Amino acid sequence: MDFLLTEEQKKLRKLTRKIALEKILPKREYFDETEEFPWEIVKELASAGLFEVYIPAEYGGKGGGVTDLAVVAEELSRVCGGIALSFAGTALGTYPILLFGNEKQKKKYLPTIARGEKLAAFGLTEPNAGSDASSIQTQAKKVEGGYLLNGTKQWITNGGEAEVYTIVAVTDKSKGARGASAFMVEKGYKGFSFGKKEKKMGIRASATRELNFSDCFVPEENLLGKEGGGFIVAMRTFDKTRPGVAAQALGIAQGALDEALSHSRKREQFGQPISSFQDIQFKLADMATQIEAARALVYSVALLIDSGAEKVSKESSMAKIFASDVAVKVTSMAVQIFGGYGYLRNYPVEKMMRDAKITQIYEGTNEIQRGIIALNLIKEIVSKK
């Protein structure tokens, strides 16, 4: 599918693949086992300019878009979905600034993120507000010169490691979904602390923590967009970043296929490589076909967004559900091809299977995505009448 990419994007893919193989692959098992945050790898990504790819040139970036983000996310995830999340999670925390930040905010935050000096994160989910995001309880009370934040955010990617956080909090409970606002909150603000690092099934190299706010003062200048526009910030951000999750899923699936192909040529049973058996061949064929279909959808949606299309919620959700469902299927099939070896932790496909599952859950469960798609389909029919 590289015919969809520019020459610069093809070079970006090649560079990212090289970094993934040379820097991430040798440490993949270590970070999965220890669950340490991969700061040494983050520094390698930063020195290669990968955090710059989707940030405009005037703020220290390379001026790329969602397609560039997808290229990097796919190639990093092809080797390790967990380590890739330090990059993808930062994109999620950065896009609200790109989309809604004023000039002062962009100049303050984007250059350091582009250089990889600071990671970013996004805080919407709460203990009792997952899919029902409109039921968030974190409060932002207006006071002289700013706001006091009180509440808890849960399962935040890059939590505790990032320096810059986009937080959605309620500023006027009486207005429902229109009563939430988005704020830039910096690590180190008084009253802002972190809970324990979660122990997860997969993506173990990624830090997931609770964010706690106790009378945390946030300056008025840190309001992102308009007061009451918090959910607009969140939804428009997800439209841009869900193809990144899809690309992560795609990369995990491709990595699993790579491993399954290699193993099927080396593993012999009944005096011949298992790749000579029709059942294995059909599994490999199905895996490859599903991956190519996912790749076509992911990159066509990314290109649609980069073309300037305004309404992309339906397509963005389609890319996420299709690619993540493919990742879960393909990684499971890869484990099956490996047989008993696939269930052992010293072979990579069991990790890929664990990593794949989260792509069906975060940035909106696939059930929620199907609802978004259906709602948009119905709206399209109604608008034509």
PLM-predicted stretches and their roles:
Residues 146, 150-194:
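A short core secondary-structure module
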Residues 91-100:
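Helix-loop "lid/cap" segments that line or gate small-molecule binding pockets
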Residues 86-87, 113, 128-131, 155-158, ...:
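Short Gly/Pro-enriched turn/cap motifs at secondary-structure boundaries
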Residues 1-79, 83, 100-105, 112-117, ...:
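Alpha-helical interface subdomain recognition
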Residues 135, 188-219:
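Flexible, small-/acidic-enriched active-site or ligand-binding loops
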Residues 116-124, 168:
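A short, Trp-centered hydrophobic/proline-enriched beta-strand micro-motif
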Residues 99-101, 141, 167-171, 184-186, ...:
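Short beta-strand-to-turn element immediately C-terminal to the catalytic PLP-Schiff-base lysine
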